[in-house]
């Protein structure tokens, strides 16, 4: 039986810390993901966009974080869980295999903590 390598990581929107002490970590996260050699990588708290962080951090990627973090040859799938004043964030899946379908299900129990489930169907070979 062949094995499948799966990794999961809450990347905390690519920033370590909050406020003026926050540090941009998205580039380090990308380097770590490249080292995983996982077939499927599930990511939580992934930014699609954030205008304040883009203005504050000189090296903020021009791409959405899921696209930026996807190793060469991987397909990034992203769905938004929360839309805020300055941007949005959600869940992402990076996969080596072809994606058949994807959907998002809102799992929020109230409007102040938006949660979502990313469901992806793929062909594994």
PLM segments and residue spans:
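Active-site/binding-pocket entry motifs
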Residues: 12-14, 75, 100
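Conserved hydrophobic/aromatic beta-strand scaffold that supports enzyme active sites
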Residues: 8, 91-93, 117-121
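N-terminal, active-site-proximal structural segment of metallo-dependent hydrolase catalytic domains
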Residues: 1-71, 83-88
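Short, solvent-exposed loop/turn elements at beta->coil junctions and helix N-caps
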Residues: 79-84, 108-109
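Active-site catalytic loop in hydrolytic enzyme cores
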Residues: 97-125
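Conserved beta strand-loop-helix elements of the APE1-like EEP
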Residues: 71-73, 86-102, 123
């Amino acid at each position: 039986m062949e094995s499948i390598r799966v990794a999961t990581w809450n990347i905390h929107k690519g920033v370590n810390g909050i406020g003026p002490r926050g540090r941009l970590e998205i580039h380090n996260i990308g380097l770590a993901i490249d080292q995983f050699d996982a077939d499927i990588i599930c990511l939580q708290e992934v930014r699609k966009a954030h205008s304040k962080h883009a203005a504050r951090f000189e090296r903020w990627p021009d791409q959405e974080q899921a696209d930026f973090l996807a190793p060469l040859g991987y397909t990034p799938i992203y769905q938004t869980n929360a839309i805020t004043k300055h941007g949005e964030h959600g869940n992402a899946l990076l996969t080596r295999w072809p994606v058949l379908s994807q959907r998002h299900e809102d799992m929020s129990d109230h409007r102040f903590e938006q949660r979502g489930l990313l469901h992806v169907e793929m062909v594994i070979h």
